[in-house]
Amino acid sequence: MEPSKLFIMSDNATFAPGPVVNAAGKKTFRTCFRILVLSVQAVTLILVIVTLGELIRMINDQGLSNQLSSITDKIRESAAMIASAVGVMNQVIHGVTVSLPLQIEGNQNQLLSTLATICTNRNQVSNCSTNIPLVNDLRFINGINKFIIEDYATHDFSIGHPLNMPSFIPTATSPNGCTRIPSFSLGKTHWCYTHNVINANCKDHTSSNQYVSMGILVQTASGYPMFKTLKIQYLSDGLNRKSCSIATVPDGCAMYCYVSTQLETDDYAGSSPPTQKLTLLFYNDTIKERTISPSGLEGNWATLVPGVGSGIYFENKLIFPAYGGVLPNSTLGVKSAREFFRPVNPYNPCSGPPQELDQRALRSYFPSYFSSRRVQSAFLVCAWNQILVTNCELVVPSNNQTLMGAEGRVLLINNRLLYYQRSTSWWPYELLYEISFTFTNSGQSSVNMSWIPIYSFTRPGLGKCSGENICPTVCVSGVYLDPWPLTPYSHQSGINRNFYFTGALLNSSTTRVNPTLYVSALNNLKVLAPYGTQGLFASYTTTTCFQDTGDASVYCVYIMELASNIVGEFQILPVLARLTIT
């Protein structure tokens, strides 16, 4: 074997040759140098990449900044355009909702004033039907059908002594005569009034005539208003009109009645509703009367009765209150079979299981006194521009929003619609609703009812239906006592307590006695002013308020059925009083 070239053996010792040691050091140096070079290159590459990234970011930021600047400029331009448009829209809204109505109202008042002057002065040749125009005194025009108070603040009230004025309501003229069921409507230009004149005591199913009048508000020398009668119609044609409702319409009055010569209970027991009459009485002595058959009447109703309280002329439509008995197997009867409304007085609630109270509330709509028909409220709606050629429509509210049907009144105040419903069923408090209609050219119109919670006083009622009852039960009791709202009702919390209204109540829980003028809030009576002697018998009352814009005085006319010991069972009396508000 050839000896190793790396080692030389001498005396058993091994020695590493010098040339071999130098080669190893060079190899280590080269390795370190290569690592260093690679590291420097790597660091350089990283720095280049970072630098390029930063440059790219700066370039992008500059572009984005330019884009944002452009977008910001466009937003500012749009904001300026929107602000300009909003300003124009605000001007339009203010003009339409404030300026234009005031201007129209001013023009209307000026026109009415001019018309009154022309009609009064042109005695030789006149286009007017008489020398006295059918136009209220200008002092009252702007104060009719307006809320007297609109600030929702707390107020105090006082009712002045009844003012001495000529009565615009005639009384019976014989001991066995009877005048009953007053209906009164005050419009911007004139007023309309009607009542039933019953020939044999107060049995209205036998034979009766209908008294209708129209007139204007004028100012007396004493400074307070007077109801001046300009036209009278006495409908004595053999038709036994009953439960008539009146409404002021352009140039006259509209009256809705039904004709029947049988007992009310017999009407409910039948299957075909009695004749419905719509009568138009104009200032030029023209009378137009039609028998109407409103859509939805036949096949659904056993009977339909006008609501007694006045109706309204609104958006070129006549709207009257109505109620009656629904046939159980009819379309309307089936649709409403499970509907009921059970209000609760939170200050004096009825105790008992809610499910049981609900069942009792449902049963209250079907009194056996009326052959267990569902007693339902409704509204008769007629298009004014086709009043002589087309039929009217029955608009029926949901019984989930109203109590058992009863007499009522439709009010139009500040262009807001309200509905008074007599508390004929178990609920003893005043019933007042805000209502809104949805009219359709084809198909069924609808109405939404929003109950206003009033707990300040109760009406008289018999037996288990007295004014002290607060629990659902079957009742046919109570009495018609409509209120006049002095303020708008607001659904905002905290201010509803300042909703005020006035009227004439009967101050007893069981008997129709003690007529009393009042002003009330939702939960408490503010003022009580008894009328007549203690124990005086009375019945229906209807109230209308208005303002003299000349001196800001507020007047209310309380029309009351009062017992008479001289002529007839009742005498209908209009009591005019001044209402002071502080």
From Swiss-Prot:
It comes from Mumps virus genotype A (strain Jeryl-Lynn) (MuV). It comes from the Viruses. It holds the Pfam family HN. The chain crosses the membrane at residues 35-55. GO terms for cellular component: host cell plasma membrane; membrane; viral envelope; virion membrane. GO terms for biological process: symbiont entry into host cell; virion attachment to host cell. Its EC number is 3.2.1.18. SUPFAM superfamilies: Sialidases. Attaches the virus to alpha-2,3-linked sialic acid-containing cell receptors and thereby initiating infection. Binding of HN protein to the receptor induces a conformational change that allows the F protein to trigger virion/cell membranes fusion. Binds to the glycan motifs sialyl Lewis (SLe) and GM2 ganglioside (GM2-glycan). The record marks R180, K242, E264, Y323, Y369, E407, R422, R512, Y540 as: Binding to the glycan motifs of the host receptor. Belongs to the paramyxoviruses hemagglutinin-neuraminidase family. Homodimer. Further forms homotetramer (dimer of dimers). Interacts with F protein trimer. The gene is HN. This is Hemagglutinin-neuraminidase. It is an enzyme of class 3 (hydrolase). The C-terminus (head domain) is involved in binding the cellular receptor. Gene3D superfamilies: 1.20.5.110, 2.120.10.10. GO terms for molecular function: exo-alpha-sialidase activity; host cell surface receptor binding.
